[in-house]
């Protein structure tokens, strides 16, 4: 199963980028052994439209270009479910075992994701009830992907 992260906004050089790169590499290595192929990250430019609805619509259109048909879409949204790491890992493992070709995680911009994208998502998840900068959400998502791979592999990284 291919896993992709589509994020509105760029992750600039600095500590967040270094941490994201570290978890990207760790998941890529651990995930290959578990049937997860080709983790990819696509950065979508932030819309410069004046109103939020137009910005979200433009960003949703750009995001949609990276979503293959029959993909499992997971929205990162503050209104989403708070999943513990083990449940998150079970979702990922189940989708892989059911033969999903692609699982796509989508991180919105400053205004969040369009209602249309949220409706299309098979699952919406949140990292707590707080609102997080998209840079931090990307790092946390990549860490959770790596953690999920270690849980599925029975590796001791996750010690809950």
From Swiss-Prot:
EC code(s) of this entry: 2.1.1.177
Main location: cytoplasm
Catalytic activity: pseudouridine(1915) in 23S rRNA + S-adenosyl-L-methionine = N(3)-methylpseudouridine(1915) in 23S rRNA + S-adenosyl-L-homocysteine + H(+)
SUPFAM superfamilies associated with the record: alpha/beta knot
MF (Gene Ontology): rRNA (pseudouridine-N3-)-methyltransferase activity
Compartments reported by the entry: Cytoplasm
Binding positions (S-adenosyl-L-methionine): 76, 108
A Pfam family recorded for this sequence: SPOUT_MTase
Main enzyme class: transferase
CDD domains registered for this protein in UniProt: RlmH-like
Keyword line: Cytoplasm, Methyltransferase, rRNA processing, S-adenosyl-L-methionine, Transferase
Top-rank taxon, per record: Bacteria
GO cellular component, one term: cytoplasm
InterPro entries xref list: Alpha/beta_knot_MTases, RlmH-like, tRNA_m1G_MTases_N
Protein family per UniProt: Belongs to the RNA methyltransferase RlmH family.
Subunit record text: Homodimer.
Function field: Specifically methylates the pseudouridine at position 1915 (m3Psi1915) in 23S rRNA.
Protein name, UniProt field: Ribosomal RNA large subunit methyltransferase H
């Amino acid at each position: 199963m291919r896993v992709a992260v589509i994020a509105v906004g760029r992750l600039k050089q600095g500590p967040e980028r270094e941490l994201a790169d570290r978890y990207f590499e760790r998941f890529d290595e651990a995930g290959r052994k578990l049937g997860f192929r080709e983790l990819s990250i696509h950065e979508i430019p932030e819309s410069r439209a004046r109103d939020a609805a137009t910005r979200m619509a433009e960003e949703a259109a750009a995001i949609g270009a990276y979503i293959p048909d029959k993909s499992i879409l997971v929205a990162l949204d503050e209104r989403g479910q708070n999943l513990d790491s083990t449940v998150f890992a079970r979702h990922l493992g189940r989708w892989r075992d059911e033969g999903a070709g692609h699982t796509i995680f989508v991180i919105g911009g400053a205004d969040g994701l369009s209602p249309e994208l949220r409706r299309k998502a098979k699952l919406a998840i949140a990292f707590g009830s707080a609102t997080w900068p998209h840079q931090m959400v990307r790092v946390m998502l990549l860490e959770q992907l790596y953690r999920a791979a270690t849980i599925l592999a029975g590796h001791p990284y996750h010690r809950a």
